[in-house]
């Protein structure tokens, strides 16, 4: 039996590669996935999955003291022809199929939501306009649940836009039929006092393609947990993300790609910029290649650009492999300040120092913004980046 190896990933804040038949991402979790909140003890901050999160800023989402109010959030779905939009109760059989909660807040959300939004794209339907889901906080506490399901060979783009002020815990499910193609853009543009904790579960069918773009700007605390599993061979997943963490903000993205099926691919790329005292970004990237997942091809990357003193980044990529019969697997993580050579080059071409710094940050994010593919959303995010830069560069 292979002995586990811990190999530091160059230039990472933290990270390792573990190669072992008995060492999996699941073994590091304090409890297995469950829909029952009672299966998860109240966290105290010493647990591996909670050690980076300031529990006192969760407003009671983690210990059962956050009680839902009737005016927590308002959800509005705009969908083109050919899409079915339903509001369903807790007992609907279509809920919970993409995966179970993996922590207490997600389980609390699952046990506390009253109604769920279910968006269904019919088999072989190809949408020419995006589905837009607006989640607007109205100042209260809310628990939410959404399901987006594509039939076989359907194609769709979904934009989920979070705005306003709320204390929200929510689960989102993406279910892709065989050969389906789904792009999801999830934007967290909350007011500065908002708290948002979410788990996103994607179940990718045979030969299906899933692309997720997570964008996080606002909020006092945002903690997101995107997860991907495969329902058949040939599936592909791309997980992209960008975040801009300001003074005293806590933004945490914890990813898991579970390669549980042969001949699937995944590509993870997240980038963040930080500025101001107390700005804290956390990125955890877990990729598990199970013994049955021969022919896997995977890569994950996290890059962080620190714009001012007083900001902190914790970046932890983890790659765990249970079979040697793979196409490729790797990871990278780096955190740094402005590239002096880039700045010198731009200034030598007559570009003022302030504008040179702006160009570097724009270029840093450009490749991920372009992954969105929706001009109006891309323009809005570029405007947000410019507004953030006004405060620092």
Describe the residue ranges of each PLM region:
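Generic hydrophobic-segment detector
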Residues: 28-31, 39-41, 299-300, 340, ...
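Conserved beta-strand/loop scaffold segments within soluble protein domains that form the structured core
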Residues: 6, 96-351, 361, 365, ...
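Residue-level "edge-of-site" marker
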Residues: 50, 359-360
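N-terminal amphipathic, basic helical "cap/leader" segment at the start of enzyme domains
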Residues: 2-115, 126-127, 131, 270, ...
